[in-house]
Amino acid sequence: FMDCSYEGDLMAHAGVSYTVGREDNSVYGETYNGVQMMQGHQFSEPIDPYVIPGDSTSGLIWGIGQDVLQPAGTGDKKIQAYNFRVCLTDDPNNMIPITRPDNYDSTRYELVLRLQAASPRKSVYNYFIWSRMPNSKTDINNRGGISTDMIGMNWDYPEADYDRRAEIWKAHEDYTKGLFYFLGHDERVPEFMRTEILKWGYPKDEYVDNNHWTHQLYVREARRMIGDLVMTEHHCVGKEVVDDVIGWAAYTMDSHNCDRIVVRGEVKNEGNCLLYTSPSPRD
């Protein structure tokens, strides 16, 4: 059989060896595995992480984890963030307004306000990769320090049961819908941004059997098989080449952030890694 799912449930139940998370760099002699504190999709400005700015006793604002930054390359069980690739439309004849979603909580987006105050964006689109598609629609993806990625909220997903996965899935949906609602309706968001986002809505003719919302959570990573050969960065950069190719990959080495933590009193994302490579045979 072939297990072509994101999760690899059949693979696991069949007793195939696998791993979850990030190997330590020492396992395969790599450089870009494990903990990575890079500049991509990062908070480049100092952002206070505490509910009451400057007061660590007030607790952390939503979306920031308790873990302490480990040395670069340290392995763990964290996985890169999931999100939804969002389809919206600005065609008024095909648009359903973005309404307040289930479980909406504006405190989840405090980081947006603090980032905007520290480094004002000139457009709401600066918070996303906002790719226009045919028929006045979009393919929206994560961008920057805070966006559609729900960083650190998916670690249980790969080996969770179906009920727990459904909870994680729903939390991602609520967060993402809430982000768009927040940007369009919270009066603390600059008026020009609210005006921009309110031009958009869910397309009437997409995902009609799922309330016009995509059926698929972007499960970027889950279980990974440990076979006779394990593909590592050495294959991706061309230092190792296989002679029994079964497939081709044509994208960069890419990991989204895995955690959001406090480093020296500031909010930082951890785990992003983007290494440009040439298309090459990947086993």
Locations of the language-model features?
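A short, hydrophobic C-terminal helix/tail in secreted or cell-surface proteins
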Residues: 279-283
